[in-house]
A protein has these predicted regions:
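Elongated scaffold/linker segments in the mid-to-C-terminal portions of large proteins
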Residues: 86, 246-455, 468, 472, ...
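Conserved, well-structured interaction surfaces
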Residues: 46-47, 81-155, 179-184, 193-205, ...
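Membrane-proximal, proline-rich intrinsically disordered regions
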Residues: 22-69, 234, 623-655
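Short coil/turn linking the two alpha-helices of tandem helical-hairpin repeats
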Residues: 152-160, 226-229, 432-435
């Protein structure tokens, strides 16, 4: 019997997935179910992609909640938060069946619907040499890879299949069969989508906004990061950043301009020491539009007309004091520890550092949170640290840095990836390259944070430098003045130069020749002022020692590295990774990346403290970094987080 494709694909697994056991993650009604795909047409294929996008709506909110509730950037309001959210926050996975957010079935719904589509779509159809189903084909492959990526990050080992599953017996066999570890999942996904990384050669569907689908380059870069293949990771993130114009060619818009210049940052003017400071907040504008988005899931603004996101009701409801999830003391403290640098006199190079007067530090957290006062309460109770990123509203910062927020409507879209992520992932990859012998790569990573992506980054793996005598075009030695103490006046000596004699590999990332990058600013400057000239934000021994709590005041009351401390290369490497992890928190807080980031960095640094201390310190108002001996943690949670097995959400057990 001929079936309508919207019904067939969008609801292929509906009526199943009751999730009483492992195989219920992927089940069909019975082995007698039959599906007729012989009459597929191009228009049906378009409708089936829309059906797949509909299923992506079902996981968008939970993707954010699972990553943030287990991380260090939120706390839960125990009087308002539903039990399911509190359990995730406490890493309590004992009642898997009752907690909808822990249920992986909807990810597998997406995956199986993608499998059905990919098995049936005809990519040979063409008109005038244009294969007009390739856009849908690549888009669906990218969605499937994205869904598997989330499962692998959350569960570590998962069932993996690429065949359409239409029978209960097959579903049971797959779900109860061997699980693939994360790296093997990524190997298979990379092989599946690598061919389609160029959005010019393989553009997303012409009928769709390309932001509906995850960019293939971002997916590849992410998976290579997890694998520790930093060369390929850097390649694809660089390609995403510099090739952004082709991704959004339909709008003739260069996304780089949305985040590379001064458009979306927080600036201060005047002297705080004289009480004349003023604040200009353009940063929060990012969250009232999707200009910088790379992947957006669209929702209805009103539940009467379709599916709505629940994030607004969780993070910033209209009810005074009703927020279930709040910004954690940990992220507020991290922001406060930053040094906001204000240029007060450019000619004389005079700068003022914010925390000296108000201890506000980086202002991005201030710019995306607000407070409520219950005017009906005799005590005028104040509720602070309410997260505004998921509420379409107007938020401004007054000169005293109090946020004024006016909520307007339900969130109608949820960004699952935005452009700034590509920059910070690129910086992460550069640091990994430095650890693999690519000299000065971490210096360029610091530039991404501090100065912006400018110039040409040329890095050599295991370079060997030698000294040679300089000769002219005739082969004669070039002479230069001999300035040694015992040299006679006017004496000359042969000139020597250091040159690169050999290297194992060379990489080059060119931003200088590309439009839009000459005015690129460091990501840290979006919330911490003029980071390019900020002496407290640098890759130098004093800043590293300050980060780990190993400085003292000398006899002239100047901060110096403690004499018993020697800053090593490993210290520099750890410091740079910590800075990127901090910047991911400051820039991308509450957007659904955090716990995965913590896991990946802890694995890369071979140090479970990277995750354990940050998570266990989320409720503490620390004024030092987690590297400092005075950093406070909740001991029971800290002990639990030291065990990597507690990082992953268990899959349901077969009954």
């Amino acid at each position: 019997m001929k079936k309508n494709l919207i019904y067939t694909v969008a609801f292929l697994l509906c009526g199943t997935l009751l999730f009483g056991s492992c195989q219920d993650m992927l089940s069909v009604d019975s082995d007698r179910v039959e599906y007729d795909f012989e009459s597929w047409s191009p228009s049906d294929s378009v409708y089936s992609v829309l059906g797949i996008l509909k299923t992506v709506q079902g996981v968008a909110d939970r993707n954010i909640l699972l990553n943030e509730l287990r991380g260090d950037l939120v706390t839960v309001n125990t009087t308002k938060a539903i039990e399911e959210l509190q359990d995730i926050y406490k890493f309590d996975f004992s009642d898997m069946e009752a907690n909808k957010y822990l249920d992986p079935k909807e990810y597998y719904t997406i995956i199986n619907n993608c499998n059905v589509f990919l098995a049936r779509v005809d990519t040979t159809l063409n008109k005038n040499g244009i294969y007009y189903m390739m856009g849908e084909y690549v888009a669906v492959k990218s969605i499937r890879a994205w869904a598997y990526l989330q499962l692998a990050v959350n569960h570590n080992e998962i069932p993996f299949f690429t065949i359409p599953v239409t029978k209960h017996s097959i579903a049971e066999e797959l779900m109860n069969g061997p699980k693939l570890p994360r790296e093997e999942v990524f190997d298979k996904l990379i092989a599946d989508i690598k061919l389609y990384e160029n959005p010019v050669t393989y553009p997303m569907p012409s009928w769709a906004n390309s932001k509906m689908f995850p960019p293939v380059r971002m997916l590849l870069g992410e998976m290579y990061l997890w694998k520790g293949d930093y060369k390929n990771a850097a390649k694809y993130f660089y390609g995403q950043i510099t090739g952004a114009m082709s991704v959004h060619a339909s709008t003739n818009q260069f996304p780089g301009k949305n985040y590379s210049d001064n458009s979306n940052r927080i600036t201060r003017s005047g002297k705080a020491s004289q009480g004349t400071t003023s604040v200009n907040n353009n940063y929060s504008d990012l969250f009232s539009s999707t200009n910088a988005s790379l992947m957006t899931v669209s929702f209805s603004s009103n539940e009467k007309y379709g599916t709505t996101s629940e994030l607004r009701e969780i993070f910033s409801p209209n009810e005074i004091g009703g927020a279930q999830v709040l910004a954690s003391p940990g992220i507020v403290s991290l922001a406060g520890m930053q040094m906001f640098c204000t240029e007060v006199d450019k000619d004389n190079k005079e700068y003022e550092y914010g925390d000296k007067y108000d201890y506000q530090g980086d202002l991005r957290i201030k710019a995306t949170t607000y407070s409520q006062i219950d005017t009906n309460d005799e005590l005028q109770t104040k509720y602070s640290n309410i997260i505004a990123k998921f509420n379409m509203g107007s938020l401004s910062l007054a000169g005293n840095l109090e946020a004024n927020f006016s909520p307007t409507s339900y969130t109608s879209s949820v960004m699952l990836q935005r452009a700034e992520l590509a920059y910070l992932r690129f910086a992460e990859a550069l640091i990994g390259l430095d650890a693999q012998g690519y000299k000065d790569a971490m210096t360029y990573a610091m530039s991404i944070l501090k100065k912006g992506a400018k110039g040409v980054y040329t890095i050599y793996q295991n370079p060997v430098y030698e000294v040679r005598e300089v000769v002219d075009e005739n082969g004669d030695p070039v002479m230069e003045p001999d300035e040694s103490e015992d040299a006679e006046e006017g004496a000359l000596k042969p000139k020597y130069e250091t040159y690169l004699a050999s290297y194992q590999d060379m990489l080059e990332f060119d931003f200088a020749s590309l439009k839009g990058f000459s005015d690129n600013i460091g990501i840290h400057s979006r919330g911490s002022g003029e980071s390019e000239v900020n002496k407290y934000y640098a890759l130098d021994p004093l800043c590293i020692a300050r980060y780990i709590g190993c400085t003292i005041r000398d006899s002239e009351d100047i901060e110096v590295v403690a004499p018993e401390v020697t800053i090593t290369y490993q210290d520099s490497l750890n410091y740079m990774r910590d800075l990127v992890l901090d910047e991911l928190a400051l820039e991308l807080s509450w957007e659904g990346y955090r716990f995965g980031d913590l896991v990946r960095f802890a694995k890369a640094m071979n140090d479970n403290d990277v995750l354990a201390k940050r998570v266990a310190g989320r409720e503490k108002e620390n004024r030092v970094t987690y590297r400092d001996a005075d950093f406070e943690v909740e001991e029971e949670l800290y002990t639990k987080m030291l065990d990597e097995s507690n990082w992953y959400i268990p899959l349901p057990v077969a009954k």
